[in-house]
Amino acid sequence: MSNINLATLDISEHPNLPTSSAVLFKAKDDKKLSFEKIASHVGRNEVATAAIFYGQAKASAEDIVRLAEVLGIDHGQLAFLLGGFPDRGKSVPFPPKDPLIYRLYEIVQNYGYAYKAVMNEKFGDGIMSAISFSTKVEKETDKDGNDWAVVTWRGKWLPYSRF
């Protein structure tokens, strides 16, 4: 028997998530599907797909069709649940309490000004978009057999306008 790690959701620990989250995660759990498998069927990146599950990304009409197919959810129900606009940024308390999410916050806390300085030197005065943005997570194993998480952020550079 293979060891499959699947992300699940205890909705009682996440009261700020939309109703769609419970429906999506239940179907994901029932079908024993990883975000990688679901994303492959939907035709999106696995982080973008997971963001839909957490109510942090907007699902397109095609995403809804494909999610309904792969998860076995009624299309009409899913279209109703995912038809609105995401209410981003409310899903976790701040600062985050989950250790992994806190470490991501800690990375920005510790290296944020260094990132900013290097980006300003490379691009000038501006910001990296989180709207024209993509991200991915990869697993890398070094020569000693240690696993490493490789997280890539790719955001369009937006220079500040002079006015």
UniProtKB/Swiss-Prot annotation:
Enzyme nomenclature, EC number: 4.2.1.104
Q: Name one Pfam family in it.
A: Cyanate_lyase
* Keywords linked to the UniProt accession: Lyase
The chemistry this enzyme catalyses reads:
cyanate + hydrogencarbonate + 3 H(+) = NH4(+) + 2 CO2
Keyword Lyase assigned: yes
* Keyword Lyase tagged: yes
This molecule's function is given as: Catalyzes the reaction of cyanate with bicarbonate to produce ammonia and carbon dioxide.
Entry-linked HAMAP family: Cyanate_hydrat (MF_00535)
Give the matching PANTHER family. Answer: CYANATE HYDRATASE
Name of the protein in its database record? Cyanate hydratase
Q: Name the encoding gene, please.
A: CYN1
